Structures are given as structure tokens and as C-alpha cells.
Amino acid sequence: MLMSKAPKLGNLLSKNSIKIVSGSKLRCNLKYINVRYISDTPDKVFTKLSDENDPQRDAFFKYSWGSWMKNDAIEKEKRVTKFSIEGLNDVLNDIYEQTKVEAKVTKEGAIKPPSFNKNLTVSLPHNLTVKNIGVINPNEKVQITSMASIHEGKHHRIYKIDTNLGKSFVLRVPYALENEDTIAQRLKSEVASMDFADLKLGIKVPKTYCFGINGLNPIRQPFILQEYIDGKLLMRDWSPLENDTSDGKPPVALQDVINKLSEFQSKLISMKFNGFGSIYFAKDAEELENVPELYDNETNEELKGRWKLGYSVERCLWKKKSFLPTDKLKTFLGPWSINKPTDIIRATGLLEAENAKVRLGLKEADSSSEAVESGVLKSQVATFENLVKLAPSLINSETKSIPNISDLLLPRLKHPDLDPMNVLVTENNEVYLLDFEGSSIKPLILQNAPQFVAYDGPKVYNIEKEVPDYEKLSDSEKAQYEFMYKRTRNQFLWEMAFNKTNPEFISIVAPPVKLLRSPYIAAIERKTDEEYILVDEAMIQLKEIWDIFTKNGLVKNSPYPIEYTTEQLEQHGKDLLKFHEKLISQPFAATQGWIPQDMFENLVAGGVLVKNKSGDYEVSSEAQSEVQSEVQSSTENKD
């Protein structure tokens, strides 16, 4: 049986698929869709199911959604997700057998602890029901019938798995961007966080059936096997730069997207925890002693002791930390006491400073191939040591100027990617939240707005009232103000929705509170080595208003804990200008040289990107001249 149409998950793009044909000679039909949308006419390539080394399978596992201007082959190799299809088939048969056993011995609706299986996978028995898993004829084996790669994300790849159970599954395979210990830790916490959100917070999430934390399981990759949700991504309804309606109101679809995500946010922060860190199943955090219960007053006996507070898996604390031994790294990851909310800031600064020192030592010993200047690493050390100095004084826990300050400092669950891309809506209008990777428990006052609405640029609330002679401006100038207005509008709509669901916490969006946490936010949202400059900028800006904050009781101590010389401030100004010029003059600097594949191919075909002697790509001299002219023009206009 051949597949005539590519499978889909909402509007996730389907790149290629495998069709498995049952019979005496099992073989796969690999289908490659070489366009960036769902095609009805995929190409077909056959391979034997039992031949794991068939080269015709390789494209199914290779990364294909983008290219890098530098080290493209190396970056793509890190994102190859080759796994054992036969092993996946074995895992599916194993959870099916568990489902049959659970149906016989377990009361319907019972919640049993996770099952740590002999094949080095972990299954969640309460999700292994006939309704969820499906059925086959007696003596028949579970058989994968087709597979499709439906999403290649930043951190993992998603496959849709069809079977003879009459059910589809989702297989999530993380990229090997970090070491094995890091991936295992994050994966354990991700599954436990989703389990907690489902059973304790009442958030709809795809049910997890089974997971493995390393390559020793039958699939030979770390993985999560989940429920397949047939729906559309909420991102389809998100048009952030859409115009207001004719009567001056925001678009209905825009407001609806924000409302749905705000409802998730309200549930996530509804529970108070007993410490800061991340959520794990109890057995996965056994090494930690003297850790308080995750939360108090559990009345359901089946949930008592199910989860435990453990090391934080917030992305910034693990990203690019492979130079540090795991045991050393864990000393910076908590969990932290409920009575010391700013210890998270201090630990972040200590970790980043230590990581920069180790990298610098390797660089100076010619033992590192990293493309980073020693001067940048030295500056990082100074920056993050300053953040350590600032942390204890940053927030006055007894201030009267911030309403409900004690509640804002309590531990609350943070989903790191609260975004329309991570929400699925079914035909029945059921709304599911996806991708809990990197979830952590931290003070609400240190949680920034989600990235899809976050905006730190100039605020414009009403163009006609706030922009003099707007109608006389050029089209390009009008477009700039329109952009500012719409970004301001979107953030304001989010804050209004937040106030509607959680009015007692609205102080976290107040401008002074945003300024207080800005150095920490700049540190945890840092994407490149050079962005330490943004942490410096936030600390320097805070210094300018520190005395005012002290008089109003917002902060603990005066004078400001960090001293800057005139020379340091002047150098910072030069470095900041240079940093912004680089972002403008070097296309894709903000994405570390990554370019969506369609755009990459078009730029190469158009001669904008050319390959140099080292095999990397760079902007052609003609295109670079145009960019530099634009940068010079914009700088002159600014002056």
C-alpha cells in the first residue's frame, strides 16, 4: 500500500516520510518532499525494513530546514537524528503489552508511578490505556505502517508514526547539541513537568507514553514517545503586524491568540512551590538529599511523592556548558531555598563567569577550536562577576512600593516557550500546550513576558497623538512608527490579558520592576558570546536610577554595588555601538549565521551569498557594499 498524500500535524511542514509495507518482504517507502510546504505528490524511494544501513534512509534523518554560513556540515551533523526503526517497533510492542496488562490489573483512572523498564525506557502506566494506544487482533504484532518527519525545531526533531493499532504517535528526538548527561537531565525534567501540568494543573498536553534518556534503549537515541494530536497550530492565527480594525480595535484573531496563551500562563503560575529549581519524577532526583517537598497539602494519595524538586534545567544554565564537568556544573543549578529568591541570579552569574574562565583557559592554552576572541571571554568574566555583586541587592523583599511583593517572590512554574508555535487547537476547539523542555520553577518577579509579545523598543500607543506631523512623513518613516505601534500594542494586549486573569500579580509588568530584572533577563536570554554587552548595558542603565529606587524602597542597598570608571563607560559605549553595527552590517548575525533553507538557496542562486576558499559562505562584495552604505546612512541620520 502506497501513500498518496504527505501526513500533516496542523501546519507543521512535512519534509519527508517513510512508508512501511507489510508482507513477506518488508520494505519502506521513503518519500522526499523537496519544497517547504505540504505536497500531495511526494517522491518515493524504497528500502528494506530490516536494512538499517540502507543509505537511501539517510535523508530521512538529516537536517534540512536551514543552512549555516559557517561550518554548515558540522552544524547539520549535530542535528542528524538517526534512530532504529526496528527498535521503535519493539518499543511500541512493549508498551502495547504493558497496556494489555494494565487493563487487567489496574483500576480505571488509577495513577501509578512511572515504570522503569528492563529495556532502559520509562513508561507512564496511567497513560497506557486501550483508548489511548489502540488495539490489534490477538496474536498480531504492532507494526509501524508509515513515518513522516513533520518538524525540525531548534532543539529536537519530531516524527509522526502511524501503526496498525489505528493510532498515530509522535516521536521527539533531541539533537546532540549538548553532552549526554545534559540531554538526559533535561529530558527527565521535561516529561515530569508535562506530567505535573496534566495531573496537577489541568493543562491539556500530549500524553507521554514512554521515554528514554540516552542511546542505550532499543531506539538508540534519547526520545519521547507521545500522543499525536490532530489539530492546527495557533501560529496560523498569529499575525503580529496586522492592522487594527476600522474602528481602531485590535484584530479579533490577535486577541484570541493572546487570551489562549494567557490562560495557560494563569494555570502555570497558579501553584506555589517550596523551592526553586525544576520538576522531576521522585526516582530521577534520588541523589538530592534534604530537599523539601515539591509543594504542600496534596490530598490525592496517588500523587503524594510522585514528583520532586531538583536541578534547574533552564536553558541558559546548560547551554554551551559542556566545558564544565557535570559534577561541577550541578553546583550552580540549585535547587535553591524558597527564602533566597535572588540566589538564582547569583548562581547564573557565578556559572557564566566560571564557564567563561574555563573557555578562556582552553583558548590561551591553544586547546580550543572555538571561534571566539579571548577579549570577549575576559569581558564576560567581568560582566558576570558584576552580576554576582548586584544580585543580593537587586530586590527588597520587604518593599511597600511593589504590591504583593511576597507573592511575586514565591516559586512559580515557568514555561520557557509560551508561544503560538507551541499550541495546538483541535477541531473541537481543545487547546494543547506543547514543548516543556527547559521548564523551571523561579520567582514570578523574574519571569519576563513571552518572546512572541516581548518588546523593548520605543513605545508608541497612539500614532496620531504621539507622532507630530505623522502624515507628512515618508512611507519608510511611517512604516517604522507602524512597527513600533504594533509591537507596543501586542505587548499591551498581553499585559491586559494577564491583569484580567491575575490582577494580584500585575506589578511584574510595571516599568520599574522590568528595569530591576533587566540585567538578569539579558543574561538568561543571551544567544551569542558578544551579547554580554547587553547585560552590561542593563546594569549601567540601572545604576543611573539606583538612588531613586533606593529612596522608594525598591532595592536594598545604596550606593550601587558596582563601580564603573569613566574609561569603562566610554569603552562600553564604543563596544555597544560596534555590536549594533555588526548586527546591521552582518546579515543573520542575530541567528548565528543560520538561514532558512528556501532563503539560503535563493540568496546563493542570486549571487548574494558566495562560497569562500574555506567552504563557508559570505555576503558577496557587491551586496556587502550596499549594506555598508545603508548602515552609514542610518548612522548619519541618527546623528
Curated annotation (Swiss-Prot):
Residues 1-45 form a transit peptide. Its main location: mitochondrion. InterPro entries: Kinase-like_dom_sf, Mito_inheritance_9. The keyword Mitochondrion applies. It is found in: Mitochondrion. Disulfide bonds: none annotated. Keywords: Mitochondrion, Transit peptide. It comes from the Eukaryota. SUPFAM superfamilies: Protein kinase-like (PK-like) (SSF56112). Residues 619-639 are annotated as: Disordered. The keyword Mitochondrion applies. One of its GO terms (cellular component) is mitochondrion. Belongs to the AIM9 family. This is Altered inheritance of mitochondria protein 9, mitochondrial. It comes from Vanderwaltozyma polyspora (strain ATCC 22028 / DSM 70294 / BCRC 21397 / CBS 2163 / NBRC 10782 / NRRL Y-8283 / UCD 57-17) (Kluyveromyces polysporus). The gene is AIM9.
